[in-house]
UniProtKB/Swiss-Prot annotation:
The modification Phosphoserine is found at residues 12, 226, 235. It comes from Homo sapiens. Component of nuclear RNase P and RNase MRP ribonucleoproteins. RNase P consists of a catalytic RNA moiety and about 10 protein subunits; POP1, POP4, POP5, POP7, RPP14, RPP21, RPP25, RPP30, RPP38 and RPP40. Within the RNase P complex, POP1, POP7 and RPP25 form the 'finger' subcomplex, POP5, RPP14, RPP40 and homodimeric RPP30 form the 'palm' subcomplex, and RPP21, POP4 and RPP38 form the 'wrist' subcomplex. All subunits of the RNase P complex interact with the catalytic RNA. Several subunits of RNase P are also part of the RNase MRP complex. GO terms for cellular component: fibrillar center; multimeric ribonuclease P complex; nucleolar ribonuclease P complex; nucleolus; nucleoplasm; ribonuclease MRP complex. Component of ribonuclease P, a ribonucleoprotein complex that generates mature tRNA molecules by cleaving their 5'-ends. Also a component of the MRP ribonuclease complex, which cleaves pre-rRNA sequences. Autoantibodies against RPP38 are found in sera from scleroderma patients. One of its GO terms (molecular function) is ribonuclease P activity. The gene is RPP38. SUPFAM superfamilies: L30e-like (SSF55315). One of its GO terms (biological process) is tRNA 5'-leader removal. It is found in: Nucleus, Nucleolus. Pfam families: Ribosomal_L7Ae. It comes from the Eukaryota. This is Ribonuclease P protein subunit p38.
Length: 283
């Protein structure tokens, strides 16, 4: 018996995955943090560590919330004896009396600082900061790379400090400190800010030239205790103002490099209509 003829092979019903096309532009500029000298790094870390220990700034977490036991069933709770419950209640009262209130202590010192990348970013946008310090151990580096342009546009000294999180986080009771900044209303870190700013290297962004200079050259040497609060605020405002080297009437000559297109890929999902042919008109 002859074999039945087979149907011609058909194409697969499974559709091919469309090619994802993304347009990207190459940035001709390389923006990076300026290198900090080893001597300045040790000075900044030691100064901050000593001051934070002297003030006693620390975050205290509630151990009850951290070591909270799961909800017990009714049967297991009924088996517990009354004597054990009474002894546990007495122990809890004693420990509660010894434990401190959870949160930052002292609270007024915490309000003078911005801790964390998000908090530092928001404070920079509101122009509330005097000095920004970023840890070098951040991975990936783009987590803090936006602070370079933002700090320079706000005329705030900023630098990347190696081992910042390793040295400062245990002192204030945190696991890590990726960014630390000092606000303009600070009163407990005035001397430290004045001592650190001259050691901060200047940032370089091609389209933000001459935005900030060495802020430590023109600092007043008078003791801050003899100055009023108004003079302190004005001195910090003058410290944060940009100082331009350009003379009157001259403008900064910034040469912008052209953007280079990496690759042009036609969109395969685009439906291309065939050109309409002109119909012959009857004579």
């Amino acid at each position: 018996m002859a074999a039945a003829p087979q149907a011609p092979g058909r194409g697969s019903l499974r559709k091919t995955r469309p090619l994802v096309v993304k347009t990207s532009l190459n940035n001709p500029y390389i923006i990076r943090w300026s290198a900090l000298e080893s001597e300045d790094m040790h000075f900044i870390l030691q100064t901050l560590e000593d001051r934070l220990k002297a003030i006693g700034l620390q975050k205290i977490e509630d151990k009850k919330k951290k070591n909270k036991t799961p909800f017990l069933k009714k049967e297991s709770r009924e088996k517990c004896s009354i004597a054990v419950d009474i002894s546990e209640n007495l122990k809890e009262k004693k420990t509660d009396a010894k434990q401190q209130v959870s949160g930052w202590t002292p609270a007024h010192v915490r309000k003078q600082l911005a801790i964390g990348v998000n908090e530092v970013t928001r404070a920079l946008e509101r122009r509330e900061l005097l000095l920004v310090l970023v840890c070098k151990s951040v991975k990936p580096a783009m987590i803090t790379s936006h602070l370079i342009q933002l700090s320079l546009s706000r005329s705030v000294p900023a630098c990347q400090v190696p081992r910042l999180s390793e040295r400062i986080a245990p002192v204030i009771g945190l696991k890590c400190v990726l960014a630390l900044a000092f606000k303009k209303n600070t009163t407990d870190f005035v001397d430290e800010v004045r001592a650190i700013i001259p050691r901060v290297p200047s940032l370089s962004v091609p389209w933000l030239q001459d935005r900030i200079e060495d802020s430590g050259e023109n600092l007043e040497t008078e003791p801050l205790e003899s100055q009023d609060r108004e003079l302190l605020d004005t001195s910090f405002e003058d410290l944060s103002k940009p100082k331009r080297k350009l003379a009157d009437g001259r403008q900064a000559s910034v040469t912008l490099q052209p953007l280079k297109i990496k690759k042009l890929i036609p969109n395969p999902n685009k439906i291309r209509k065939p050109p309409k042919s002109k119909k012959a008109t009857p004579k």
